[in-house]
């Protein structure tokens, strides 16, 4: 019997960081990044730190010019959104091929960063800042 490998045209991945959530689609292309309908450079204010973060999973596998990244992201600021996109792209690459999982995991692209804003407690001015202490 002839077994055929099914190949999809679109690979999905969801990433989260702080309060940001990114839905990432990988489409065979030439490395264009589109975030919320704008170019990746424009959306991330041409910040090389954020741009490199978004491209990191593809660069780890050497696929930066093989797939276009289409992103719908909301919540948080640019840093949180860039890291959410990174995680979403890494998850989409795992969907592309199970062999991609190991190198992405060793680079840390698949792990969710649990750091988030600590809540404010009553009796304090901020999460940990206490009012000035007076002995007398």
Curated annotation (Swiss-Prot):
Keyword 4Fe-4S (UniProt): no
Region annotation Disordered: where it falls in the sequence: 97-136
Pfam hit, one: Ribosomal_S9
Lineage top rank: taxon: Bacteria
Any one Gene Ontology cellular component term annotated for this protein: cytosolic small ribosomal subunit
Gene3D superfamilies for the chain: 3.30.230.10
Basic residues bias: start-end ranges: 117-136
Bias (Basic and acidic residues) ranges: 98-116
Single GO term (MF): structural constituent of ribosome
One record GO biological process: translation
Keywords of the record: Ribonucleoprotein, Ribosomal protein
Family recorded in the similarity comment: Belongs to the universal ribosomal protein uS9 family.
Name listed for the protein in its UniProt record: Small ribosomal subunit protein uS9
């Amino acid at each position: 019997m002839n077994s055929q490998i099914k190949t999809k045209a679109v690979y999905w991945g969801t990433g989260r960081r702080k309060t940001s959530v990114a839905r990432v689609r990988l489409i065979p292309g030439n490395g264009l990044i589109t975030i919320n309908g704008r170019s990746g450079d424009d959306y991330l204010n041409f910040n090389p730190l954020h741009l490199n973060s978004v491209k990191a999973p593809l660069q780890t596998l050497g696929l930066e010019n093989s797939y276009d990244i289409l992103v719908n992201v909301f919540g948080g600021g640019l840093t949180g959104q860039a890291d959410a996109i990174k995680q979403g792209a890494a998850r989409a690459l795992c969907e592309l091929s199970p062999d991609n999982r190991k190198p992405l995991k060793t680079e840390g692209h698949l792990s969710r960063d649990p750091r988030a804003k600590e809540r404010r407690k009553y009796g304090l001015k901020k999460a940990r800042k206490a009012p000035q202490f007076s002995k007398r």
